[in-house]
Amino acid sequence: MYDFSQELHWDFLLCGSITIFSGFLMRWFTKEHKNSEIKKRDGYLIVVGGWLFMTLFGSLPYLISGSIPDLTNAFFETMSGFTTTGSTILDDIESLPKSILFWRSMTQWIGGMGIIVLTIAILPLLGIGGMQLFSAEAPGPSADKLHPRITDTAKRLWLIYVSYTVIETIFLQLAGMSFFDAVNHSMSNIASGGFSTKNASLGHWLSLIHISEPTRQEA
């Protein structure tokens, strides 16, 4: 089993330190508004700002490691990951360190679950979430009584999400993938993103797929 945790650990430690320090700064500058009521306009700003800041800090591993030295390209690659778009600016994916490939797949895994959490937690506050549609369409008891608390829902979704990822990893290993490739493809597949660790994507493993025709016995 390949130990990809040993690559670029100082780069990722620096990225994490920058992100945590920036988070503390933002929290310190906004502590006076801790108990302020969030209005619809503030909600839009939080959603847009959250995506932008998440992508900006998510670009740091590419930039600091030198895997993608250009800010524009690193930002695009990270945004593509978090939004599970699947587009990439990389020509030779296999030349990247495996720790960077793992982070690249993880952006899609986080983004895939982030979309769900955004839908059930943020968008309803803006008046455009699923709860409004549920309230308008569902007869009988109110939606609040039928819908569990957001935190409980998020925990259950995360449990299902992680479980499916583990199960797919096991199946991909049984199909012939290495543990590293299986983990990465499970994270990207479960998020419907499409990032791969190979230049040919799943085509790299076509040699493992054997299609056999049933033998016909002559009468």
What do these predicted regions represent?
Residues M1-N73:
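N-terminal alpha-helical transmembrane segments of multi-pass membrane transport
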Residues W51-A136, R156-H185, G193, R216:
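Transmembrane-helix bundle segments that line or gate the permeation/cavity pathway
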Residues R149-W158, H204-L208:
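Membrane-water interface at loop-to-transmembrane-helix junctions
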Residues I209-A219:
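Single conserved hydrophobic/aromatic residue that forms the stacking wall/gate
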Residues L45, T107, H147-K155:
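Alpha-helical membrane-interface segments at transmembrane helix boundaries
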Residues S188-N189, G193, K198-S201:
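A structural feature that tracks compact, well-ordered secondary-structure segments
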Residues H33-I38, L96, A138-T153:
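Cytosolic juxtamembrane amphipathic/interface segments immediately preceding
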Residues F4-L14, W103-T107, S201-I209:
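Interfacial loop-to-helix junctions that mark the boundaries of transmembrane helices
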